[in-house]
């Protein structure tokens, strides 16, 4: 079990511990990409809140102009997070500062919205720009072209692929398509508060080789954390705190005796005396309550 856990942790990115790639000259531009329903808009607010809490001055950008009410949703999320939102039409004002409204001619043109937002961020001294892009129910070329156009227009420092942790086997094909389409630089897992153990994380990390940077673990703005490969490996294996148990066993149980018992068990020669010895070894570990 320990070996499997270690290998899973390695695949998920043990030792990577890569922070966000911040620009030497602000603003740092972060573009979010993913399928519709993956939770990009909500995650944009969480990331903005996390950055604000870390001392940054983020600006959210509503570049999803296709999904009904997507702009309004981001404005509401921005208001809750206390982070201003740049949008192509006037809407809810954020508590994070003055309402940021783009010129009317940008309506319907997500590329221009993104480009103008970056220029405004430079003027108003926002140090981070988070661009929420449109998604689809499935991968298609129109989606990828729009994402590529935005990428080419603003040259983001990070392109974060947002994926639903409950997506299952579709994670592989989706991740491949977005990796080939926009060449994302990192992954964010959303909806980890559900029943999913996070197998999608293993699939995406293995197929793309891109680091998983963050995980969204609930509906609240604060339910957002830096990704920890070791914890995700334990979640996938549904192990709980079994690693501590393994460490205790390694310390207390004699290795030579354990190998002898394993050999007897494999050959079918295990006796009641051997079973007694095993119980005595387990007893050395202390109370079962521990």
List each model region and its residues.
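Non-catalytic, charged/low-complexity accessory segments that flank nucleotide-binding cores
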Residues: 1-14, 18, 25-28, 56-57, ...
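Conserved phosphate-handling catalytic cores of large alpha/beta enzymes
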Residues: 114-118, 122, 126, 138, ...
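Active-site-adjacent beta-strand anchor residues
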Residues: 61-63, 164, 281
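Glycine-centered loop/turn positions within well-structured domains
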Residues: 68, 202, 289
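Short, surface-exposed acidic/glycine-rich loop or hinge patches that mediate macromolecular interfaces
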Residues: 64-68, 91, 107-108, 165-168, ...
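Short glycine-rich anion-binding loops that position phosphate/pyrophosphate groups of nucleotides
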Residues: 134-136
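Primarily NTPase-proximal linker/entry elements flanking Walker-type ATP/GTP-binding cores
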Residues: 1-100, 111-123, 127-131
């Amino acid at each position: 079990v320990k070996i499997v856990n270690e290998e899973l942790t390695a695949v998920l990115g043990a030792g990577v511990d890569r922070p966000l790639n911040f620009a030497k000259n602000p603003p740092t531009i972060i573009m979010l990409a993913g399928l519709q329903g993956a939770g990009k808009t909500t995650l944009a607010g969480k990331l903005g809140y996390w950055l604000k809490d870390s001392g940054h001055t983020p600006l959210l950008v509503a570049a999803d102009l296709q999904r009904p009410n997507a702009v309004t949703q981001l404005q509401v999320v921005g208001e809750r997070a206390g982070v201003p939102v740049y949008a192509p039409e006037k809407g809810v004002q954020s508590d994070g500062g003055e309402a940021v409204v783009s010129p009317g001619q940008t309506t319907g043109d997500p590329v221009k919205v993104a480009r103008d937002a970056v220029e405004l961020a430079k003027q108003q001294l926002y140090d981070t720009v988070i661009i929420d892009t449109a998604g689809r129910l499935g991968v298609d070329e129109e989606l990828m072209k729009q994402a590529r156009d935005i990428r080419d227009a603003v040259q983001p420092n990070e392109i974060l692929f947002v994926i639903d942790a409950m997506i299952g086997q579709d994670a592989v094909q989706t991740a491949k398509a977005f990796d080939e389409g926009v060449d994302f630089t990192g992954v964010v897992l959303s909806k980890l508060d559900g029943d999913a153990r996070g197998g999608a994380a293993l699939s995406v990390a293995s197929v793309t080789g891109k680091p998983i940077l963050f995980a969204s673990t609930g509906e609240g703005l604060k339910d957002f954390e830096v990704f920890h490969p070791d914890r995700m490996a334990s979640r996938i294996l549904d192990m709980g705190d079994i690693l501590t148990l393994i460490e205790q066993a390694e310390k207390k149980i004699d290795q030579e005796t354990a190998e002898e018992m394993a050999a007897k068990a494999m050959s079918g020669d295990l006796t009641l005396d051997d079973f007694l010895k095993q119980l005595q070894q387990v007893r050395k570990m202390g109370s079962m309550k521990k």
